[in-house]
Amino acid sequence: MDEGFNTFIDLHNAAQFFAGTPYGDTIEANPLHLAATHTTAGEEQPLIANPTEVRDLMWVGYQKPALMLQTLRFEVLGADRFDPAFRDYIRTWAFRHPTPADFFRLMRDASGMELDWFWRDWIYTTARLDQAVDSVSTDSSGHAMVFLSNRGTMILPAELRITYDDGTIESVRLPVEMWNLGPRFSYRLTSAKRVRRVEIDPRHVLPDLRRSNDLWERRP
């Protein structure tokens, strides 16, 4: 995990320091683009694997931990909570030898959020994310109901982008607790306008391995 932390820090620092230069414009601060080619079912190993037994060291040792921290910072905690907690971890454990559990506890206490579900999926398993928009229907009051499913084994918060017939766009963020009762969730829109299109993870920032079910569009 140490090298993954270094990768996370180095990528972001380099992207900011060299911003606006030919080199800076080529830096992929988010290693999400590598996920599809390094997460083959039955081949990927968890981050907690013994380093001497790791087959794909570049992914397990460097890029996946960086992607994990990227996701935690921007999509789970937000930079306003992640950054102070991460700095606190660095100050607290500088020149010492923390274990993964030490990092987990400090991030929980400093951020104020229980993160066991996150560490389980990212570190102890090779869980995969597959969020989907199953369908959209209209209830008796004229409001649209959006039916979502989590078809993978990883859970993460969800972001929806709803496009209405009049061209207006609404963005909705749903917390990870939406999956507490199972892999299906329905969300009732506050607007009664006719829905043209619903997309989950519209910014493509989550490691969703199947994009084909991320979009629902009303048929003409």
Q: Which ranges hold each PLM region?
A:
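Intrinsically disordered, low-complexity regions enriched in Ser/Pro/Gly/Gln/His and often acidic
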Residues: S111-L115, V172, L209
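Short, solvent-exposed mixed-charge patches
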Residues: R219-P220
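Short acidic/polar inter-strand loop motif in beta-rich domains
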Residues: P202-N213
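Histidine-centered catalytic/metal-binding microenvironments
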Residues: W216
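Hydrophobic alpha-helical and helix-loop surface patches within well-folded domains
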Residues: M1-N150
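Beta-strand-rich binding/interaction modules
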Residues: F82, D116, L129-A132, V136-P202
